[in-house]
């Protein structure tokens, strides 16, 4: 019985939140595109210049999904853009969309540790991955493959909310693209 009440109150809160979002004023937002390299993204993430906000979910990709994403970059395939909120007061950027991708690249290239079980981050040993990269850590890639991965550019859409004076655009954008 308590669980049902909790579910009902969650639904009511969610409805109220959606109504509040629907009644927001019009936004005044500046947005621009950028094409940072993977090297730039993981350096900024490592140094705390790009952060995961509380609204973002935790890391949820499994190793197969993460491996396929890295392989996509190694193959030269296009990947979705990331969304970053520019916070003028701190000079930081918050990841609105793209956390799984940025974290995967950071962990593979920078840490070399798979978050799921703290093992060495190797691409999966499966037919879904090109045999050239199958079961390899970043350090085991050829120098040209390492360079290709680090130099790969991922399009970023960066925005800065000017009005209203709260951060509601961040929530609106997050909710609409996720």
Residue map of PLM features:
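Basic- and aromatic-enriched surface patches that contact anionic nucleotides/nucleic acids
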Residues: 2-14, 18, 22-40, 53-178
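A short, surface-exposed helix-loop junction/capping segment
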Residues: 46-54
